[in-house]
């Protein structure tokens, strides 16, 4: 029997066994069934979600604070009212010294008052905590001082302070307040810090007042000063006076304290009936400054509304209880999440996927924004990407609005992996939970201008609808649903691999290349294609999580074989193109071989230490290695550094890790990868062993 006939017969038999219609009439391409979509679309309310945003944004709810706890109690009260009775708050010690893996916990903080006044050359108020809460930098402690102002530029580097006496003075800087505070106050005896957004940051918004914190260690508590945030417009006035040679005298009054606290999380569930030990996780960080409306009262409120809608539909009998548990997790961003993962190691095994809701309610016109979804990184390929993308596309074709919301079309992007929120904790290599983020870029993010008037009930409803549909699908999927998803993953995966093939071709397509440069580009191109298919094979296999019947498994194996055939075709295409370009250059075709450096790297296996789980915290290497400039010396940064660590599994060689991150992003020097991993080894985070 020919392969084509075999595949067709397998398709027919499987479709009949699962009761799938083979009609080729116009089809609904959404993976979530119409009945569930209709019920959720009717029940979910952007108006109710926005009302919760209003309530949550009234709390000044930074991590490890009483305000966070009060906001959590508000959510717990609503959950109980909706019939979800198992909500609970957990907490773990947090004091600026205790670590969970590489992450140092924040101190607790509370404040009663904070004002900053100009005394000379003219009296005027610059900042008031009561009026605008973000003007007082979090973790500021009680002071009542009058002191001279000194401009220290960024205030981040030692050379910013050369020839400048800051002791007993207040410094003005553009750097992050916590870092400036450590340099100016803790190390050099300044009294306090005033910071503003640098000129190249959100340049069209000169009146923004940012949210920042000092992040002191508990051992530094006797040296902690204070900080105020002002607008760029206000800073220009101060700099103008200083530039004119005028003495600028300020009066700062703060009533605040830091203390040993707890970092808290709150969870609630809709229990599963068939596979209760398997969990679909919806999370979002509850913390932030007051108001923090879109960031992230919107995500916290959206979770609450999804929980309400699902529980209401179940209690009415319109939906049956889910087969798998749906867990809602209101987190303290990053610091609480890592503490939760440390104290709940079962998360890695129980959680099949995570949807992180962070800034989901933007009015797209007022914020000049759009909705985006981040894909999982290549170190953690998953069906989740295609399930979510399918629902996002479906939502863009449905006229979803809210009574008091906007009527604008749904503007969205599907983005490559990016961090910056709690999904980055879950999808990290040692945790291994596929995770995506739903969010919006927003110029008002982390500023006092992140207010409720910029929250759109229509956008809230749309995003809640996508999240609820995807969560419900995962909580109930079995063979029939898995088959549809497998098709989606395989076909979209082939398209993604095709784009990577184009990237490989373009890398070779340089008319000025030498034969050696062309060979290197060819070698990298082959790596790109192989990596692309590794990613897509892994994503397709992840669908097997929902499969119980052998015919479905067999069909998915056939889809894998088809992917394999396409991989061979793509690699042949790269090889043929390389041959053509060699012919043009008049040089011989070279076979791919390993250099001596690559042969050595292929024998080196990288192993994580048992205590190194979760992402590497910023500042940990500086603290561990005793070099505060270490971050500037790192040969790898950002997503490439993150993925380099994620690909460490105790089996991959140094060369394989280098090839993986190069296939995902761009060619990375093997020397840079080894240098970075050697730094981690020196810090006790990994071991590099020779393969025996």
Sequence positions of predicted segments:
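Bacterial N-terminal signal peptides
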Residues: 10-19
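Noncatalytic luminal/extracellular "stalk/propeptide" segments of secretory-pathway proteins
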Residues: 26-35, 42, 46, 54-167
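Soluble metallo-hydrolase cores and metallopeptidase-like ectodomains found primarily
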Residues: 32, 109, 131-160, 214-294, ...
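Short helix-loop-beta-strand segments that form the rim/entrance of peptidase-like active sites
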Residues: 51, 309-339, 347, 357
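Extracellular/luminal Protease-associated
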Residues: 54, 66, 127-226, 295, ...
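Metal-dependent peptidase/peptidase-like ectodomains
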Residues: 126-127, 227-228, 235-236, 275, ...
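His/Asp/Glu-rich mid-to-C-terminal helical/loop segments that flank catalytic regions of hydrolases
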Residues: 324, 443-499, 560-561, 568, ...
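Short capping segments at the starts of secondary-structure elements
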Residues: 645-656
